[in-house]
């Protein structure tokens, strides 16, 4: 016996509607994830084009004026003596140009540049492979140097201080240490967590320099330079709009420039003006102070659940669902820099400036925009 459905032709059953609704939610989440990633200071694997935007000389390098002056003196002195640069350690939040500065130094010295990361140096043979092939004046750059394994770090001590590689030959009672002379080289380390470095390693660097967040006018110049390299039409007002939402970070500024360029090509005539930049970045949920949804969530949770603080890092992480290290290394530095968050002995506290930006009033515990 045939069974005839009473549903109208073409009508969706509840299962189909649920599948489509789930698909829309997944698409929405994916779109938000893409937008949220715009403000991550770490490099994305897809950002290979960033290499073409890097300055090659100190003269091309924009910002970090005091650091450039110190480094230019070090370069001139080393050249005059015919010696390699002293070992250098750069620290600061991600995305500020530590790798770029290291590459520029090598170029200015006319030296070969070798780059690696601490997590890639798992065993002594990994670091030994780099050290034995370095020639006079070569530069070895180790990113995330605070993550070096202890046994690898200890191999660096005589290499940095005496240009000697000590290796153990044999096992047990027959084991002996053999020293291999090394060419005089320059080690440049970079870290976002200078406090995580051991004193013996930190003390072996001739210079320890901090990279600061960039000023809006410096970022605007970086955006203008990158736009020229990308053959993108932009005026100064458009560059300034992108710059002020870039969290003081060149990597983010270049990333936002590329997304605004896409928006200008699809929704406009290809030229980036202040209005076009503002419209694009609002679409990507980047507000005028460079805050994204996660930044606002962190601040809002502090206000609405804890009266503005103080709140401990672990508590913040548990309530927001974010990793404590991510909060401390990705979100907090910029919120501290712009005066929206304070660290106290008892925990994190939201400032009046943050309350005003989020739309809170003194009379109401809830945000005006909620």
Swiss-Prot record:
<keyword id="KW-0227">DNA damage</keyword>
<dbReference type="InterPro" id="IPR036390">
    <property type="entry name" value="WH_DNA-bd_sf"/>
</dbReference>
<dbReference type="InterPro" id="IPR008824">
    <property type="entry name" value="RuvB-like_N"/>
</dbReference>
<feature type="binding site">
    <location>
        <position position="54"/>
    </location>
    <ligand>
        <name>ATP</name>
    </ligand>
</feature>
<keyword id="KW-0234">DNA repair</keyword>
<feature type="binding site">
    <location>
        <position position="99"/>
    </location>
    <ligand>
        <name>ATP</name>
    </ligand>
</feature>
<dbReference type="GO" id="GO:0016887">
    <property type="term" value="F:ATP hydrolysis activity"/>
</dbReference>
<feature type="binding site">
    <location>
        <position position="99"/>
    </location>
    <ligand>
        <name>Mg(2+)</name>
    </ligand>
</feature>
<feature type="binding site">
    <location>
        <position position="348"/>
    </location>
    <ligand>
        <name>DNA</name>
    </ligand>
</feature>
<keyword id="KW-0963">Cytoplasm</keyword>
<feature type="binding site">
    <location>
        <begin position="161"/>
        <end position="163"/>
    </location>
    <ligand>
        <name>ATP</name>
    </ligand>
</feature>
<keyword id="KW-0547">Nucleotide-binding</keyword>
<comment type="similarity">
    <text>Belongs to the RuvB family.</text>
</comment>
<dbReference type="GO" id="GO:0006310">
    <property type="term" value="P:DNA recombination"/>
</dbReference>
<feature type="binding site">
    <location>
        <position position="95"/>
    </location>
    <ligand>
        <name>ATP</name>
    </ligand>
</feature>
<dbReference type="GO" id="GO:0006281">
    <property type="term" value="P:DNA repair"/>
</dbReference>
<dbReference type="Pfam" id="PF05491">
    <property type="entry name" value="RuvB_C"/>
</dbReference>
<dbReference type="InterPro" id="IPR041445">
    <property type="entry name" value="AAA_lid_4"/>
</dbReference>
<comment type="function">
    <text>The RuvA-RuvB-RuvC complex processes Holliday junction (HJ) DNA during genetic recombination and DNA repair, while the RuvA-RuvB complex plays an important role in the rescue of blocked DNA replication forks via replication fork reversal (RFR). RuvA specifically binds to HJ cruciform DNA, conferring on it an open structure. The RuvB hexamer acts as an ATP-dependent pump, pulling dsDNA into and through the RuvAB complex. RuvB forms 2 homohexamers on either side of HJ DNA bound by 1 or 2 RuvA tetramers; 4 subunits per hexamer contact DNA at a time.</text>
</comment>
<protein>
    <recommendedName>
        <fullName>Holliday junction branch migration complex subunit RuvB 2</fullName>
        <ecNumber>3.6.4.-</ecNumber>
    </recommendedName>
</protein>
<dbReference type="InterPro" id="IPR003593">
    <property type="entry name" value="AAA+_ATPase"/>
</dbReference>
<feature type="region of interest" description="Disordered">
    <location>
        <begin position="1"/>
        <end position="54"/>
    </location>
</feature>
<dbReference type="InterPro" id="IPR027417">
    <property type="entry name" value="P-loop_NTPase"/>
</dbReference>
<feature type="binding site">
    <location>
        <position position="214"/>
    </location>
    <ligand>
        <name>ATP</name>
    </ligand>
</feature>
<feature type="region of interest" description="Head domain (RuvB-H)">
    <location>
        <begin position="288"/>
        <end position="370"/>
    </location>
</feature>
<dbReference type="GO" id="GO:0009378">
    <property type="term" value="F:four-way junction helicase activity"/>
</dbReference>
<feature type="binding site">
    <location>
        <position position="100"/>
    </location>
    <ligand>
        <name>ATP</name>
    </ligand>
</feature>
<feature type="region of interest" description="Small ATPAse domain (RuvB-S)">
    <location>
        <begin position="215"/>
        <end position="285"/>
    </location>
</feature>
<dbReference type="InterPro" id="IPR004605">
    <property type="entry name" value="DNA_helicase_Holl-junc_RuvB"/>
</dbReference>
<feature type="binding site">
    <location>
        <position position="98"/>
    </location>
    <ligand>
        <name>ATP</name>
    </ligand>
</feature>
<feature type="binding site">
    <location>
        <position position="343"/>
    </location>
    <ligand>
        <name>DNA</name>
    </ligand>
</feature>
<dbReference type="GO" id="GO:0005737">
    <property type="term" value="C:cytoplasm"/>
</dbReference>
<dbReference type="InterPro" id="IPR008823">
    <property type="entry name" value="RuvB_C"/>
</dbReference>
<feature type="binding site">
    <location>
        <position position="251"/>
    </location>
    <ligand>
        <name>ATP</name>
    </ligand>
</feature>
<keyword id="KW-0067">ATP-binding</keyword>
<dbReference type="Pfam" id="PF05496">
    <property type="entry name" value="RuvB_N"/>
</dbReference>
<feature type="binding site">
    <location>
        <position position="204"/>
    </location>
    <ligand>
        <name>ATP</name>
    </ligand>
</feature>
<dbReference type="InterPro" id="IPR036388">
    <property type="entry name" value="WH-like_DNA-bd_sf"/>
</dbReference>
<dbReference type="GO" id="GO:0000400">
    <property type="term" value="F:four-way junction DNA binding"/>
</dbReference>
<dbReference type="GO" id="GO:0048476">
    <property type="term" value="C:Holliday junction resolvase complex"/>
</dbReference>
<dbReference type="GO" id="GO:0005524">
    <property type="term" value="F:ATP binding"/>
</dbReference>
<feature type="region of interest" description="Large ATPase domain (RuvB-L)">
    <location>
        <begin position="13"/>
        <end position="214"/>
    </location>
</feature>
């Amino acid at each position: 016996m045939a069974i005839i459905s009473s549903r109208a032709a073409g009508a969706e059953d509840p299962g189909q509607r649920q599948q489509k609704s789930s698909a829309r939610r997944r698409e929405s989440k994916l779109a938000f994830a893409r937008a949220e990633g715009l403000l991550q200071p770490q490099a994305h694997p897809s950002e290979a084009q960033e290499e073409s935007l890097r300055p090659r000389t100190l003269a091309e390098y924009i910002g970090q004026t005091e650091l450039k002056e110190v480094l230019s003196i070090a370069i001139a002195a080393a050249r005059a003596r015919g010696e390699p640069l002293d070992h250098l350690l750069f620290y600061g939040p991600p995305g500020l140009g530590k790798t770029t500065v290291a590459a520029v130094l090598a170029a200015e010295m006319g030296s070969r540049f070798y780059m690696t990361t601490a997590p890639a140096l798992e065993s002594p043979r990994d670091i030994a492979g780099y050290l034995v092939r370095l020639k006079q004046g070569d530069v070895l750059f180790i990113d995330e140097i605070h993550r070096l394994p202890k046994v690898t770090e200890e191999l660096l001590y005589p290499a940095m201080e005496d240009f000697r590689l000590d290796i153990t030959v044999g096992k047990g009672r027959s084991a002996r240490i053999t020293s291999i002379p090394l060419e005089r080289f320059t080690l440049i380390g970079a870290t976002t967590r200078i406090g995580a470095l051991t004193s013996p390693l930190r003390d072996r660097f001739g210079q320890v320099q901090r990279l600061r967040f960039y000023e809006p006018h410096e970022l605007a110049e970086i955006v203008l330079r990158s736009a020229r390299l990308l053959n993108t039409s932009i005026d100064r007002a458009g560059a300034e709009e992108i710059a002020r939402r870039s969290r003081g970070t060149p990597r983010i500024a270049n990333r936002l420039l590329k997304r605004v360029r896409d928006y200008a090509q699809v929704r406009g005539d290809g030229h980036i003006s202040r209005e076009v930049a503002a419209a694009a970045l609002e679409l990507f949920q980047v507000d005028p102070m460079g805050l994204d949804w996660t930044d606002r969530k962190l601040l809002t949770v502090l206000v609405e659940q804890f009266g503005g603080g103080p709140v401990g890092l672990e508590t913040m992480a548990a309530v927001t669902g974010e990793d404590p290290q991510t909060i401390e290394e990705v979100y907090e530095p910029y919120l501290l820099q712009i005066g929206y968050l304070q660290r106290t002995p008892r925990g994190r506290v939201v400032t009046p400036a943050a309350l005003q930006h989020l739309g809170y009033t003194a009379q109401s515990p809830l945000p005006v925009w909620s």
